[in-house]
C-alpha cells in the first residue's frame, strides 16, 4: 500500500506519492525568477536554502492556483533519472488536504501519450472519479531544469 497526497487542478483530482514529499507548508511567498516560464512561481527560502517553486495549475492549464486556505506549497524530492542529484522543489497545489492509501497497482495506464505533459502518470478510478498520479521526476523540461538547477561549475 502506498500513501498519496491528493490535490485538484480545476475539477480534476491528482495524486503525489507521499514518499516524494519532504514537507507540506502553507502557501508561501516567492521571489520572481526572470526568464523562467510563467508556471515557475518563483524562489523561496527554506532552512536557509533557495527552493524553486512551480505552480502546478499554471503548468497544466495556464491558469495559476487560487490562493485559498487549502492551497499549499509542497516541497518534494526532485531527481531527474535514477542517478541524478536530489533537489528540493516546491509545488503550489490547490485543495491539498486529503490523502489516499491504496495499492499502487490500482493505477493503470491512461491510454494517452502526453508528450507535452510527461509528468502525467497512470490513473485510478474510485467512487469519486479518476485520480491521476503526477510523476515528480518528469515535471521539468530539460531547459527549465537547467535554469532552476544548473550543473555545478568545475573546480
Regions found by a protein language model. Name each.
Residues 1-155:
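An acidic, low-aromatic, low-complexity terminal/linker signal
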Amino acid at each position: 500500500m502506498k500513501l498519496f497526497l491528493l490535490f485538484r487542478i480545476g475539477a480534476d483530482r491528482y495524486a503525489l506519492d507521499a514518499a516524494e514529499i519532504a514537507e507540506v507548508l502553507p502557501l508561501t511567498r516567492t521571489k520572481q525568477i526572470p526568464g523562467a516560464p510563467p508556471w515557475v512561481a518563483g524562489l523561496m527560502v527554506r532552512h536557509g536554502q533557495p527552493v524553486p517553486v512551480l505552480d502546478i495549475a499554471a503548468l497544466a492549464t495556464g491558469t495559476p492556483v487560487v490562493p485559498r486556505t487549502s492551497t499549499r506549497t509542497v516541497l518534494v524530492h526532485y531527481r531527474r533519472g535514477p542517478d541524478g542529484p536530489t533537489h528540493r522543489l516546491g509545488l503550489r497545489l490547490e485543495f491539498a488536504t486529503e490523502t489516499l492509501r491504496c495499492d499502487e497497482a490500482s493505477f493503470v495506464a491512461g491510454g494517452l501519450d502526453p508528450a507535452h505533459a510527461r509528468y502525467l502518470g497512470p490513473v485510478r478510478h474510485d467512487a469519486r472519479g479518476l485520480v491521476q498520479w503526477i510523476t515528480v521526476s518528469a515535471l521539468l523540461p530539460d531547459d527549465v531544469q537547467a535554469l532552476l538547477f544548473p550543473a555545478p561549475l568545475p573546480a
